[in-house]
Amino acid sequence: LTITDLQIPNYEHVASAEEDDYRGFVAIHSTKLGPAVGGTRFWKYENDEAAIRDLLRLARGMTYKNALAGIPFGGGKSIVLRPDGDIDREKIFRAHGRFVNTFGGQYITAED
């Protein structure tokens, strides 16, 4: 699993990861209220820029949603880029799980 940190202003941590057919992103907008919580979107985007733009918008939105709900969680989001053709979903999502685990509990996800 190859992980690359991305420097994005006003976000605590943004990174991408790749392994075989897996490509994904995680954005942590804020952990001020607790670990960042947000779903994982499995989607085909036009390009990486579009995926990152959506990722950042959704992570920021989760910060506000969780704060307004009064729950002790910050905001984050992840995206798994859906590859073309036949795919091994289990292999792809296991790679994503390994990526999420590198955040040491600072990001908690579920399906989008």
Per-region residue spans from a language model:
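N-terminal ligand-binding/catalytic initiation module
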Residues: 1-112
